[in-house]
């Protein structure tokens, strides 16, 4: 147990720059390139392509700044990160014969990059929770919101990023169809906020290590199996059925629309019977 605690403590002291941050920029820009029409936008408007990629890379910081009424352009003050992300963007889109992109598209390398990106997700959630706590002491809902925004901002502002590329898909709103990264980031924000308030009986570095291992394991599994379904789907379906499903009226109990207006009127069968009796009387 002591060795695990020491390992998790050393893990929590890792520096994200430059290797993990570079992996984050690589995976983010490659994801941006793989969107429909992104390559065409890069050939027609490099500025729009660059801005779109920067939203993928720094969307979390931009969104959290907006929510806390801070200047969203403050992200530009980190010149080193902007230059590094811009260099990655240029290499991914404009390197001759796409050699740079194809090199990092190789599955084993991409698995490593994806795992490193999940490490940065944990750090971003933590920084968001701590940043919100510095503004609003022990405001758990604010801490969860900012941690969520900092860790999954690129997904949460995806509609705005699409507008930059000239695409408008309101049905792809993350609040309507929440993707797995956004869901798991929200769970992480809740866990780290509860731990920060000492509502969870676990140290921060142990929670960081366990949560990051979970992220990496699920991400690698989804990439190897090429699955896009959320691993939380069975639980979500059960909870939705129990808590949020409307009670359905059995079909045999429902009345037809015309039945309410026919109350008090004799049925067609009765009318036919009565008319038949009248005809018999006439014949007699």
From Swiss-Prot:
GO terms for molecular function: identical protein binding; potassium channel activity. The keyword Membrane applies. It is found in: Endoplasmic reticulum membrane. It is a multi-pass membrane protein. InterPro entries: TRIC_channel (IPR007866). GO terms for cellular component: endoplasmic reticulum; endoplasmic reticulum membrane. Belongs to the TMEM38 family. Homotrimer; conformation seems to be controled by binding to diacylglycerol (DAG). This is Trimeric intracellular cation channel type B.
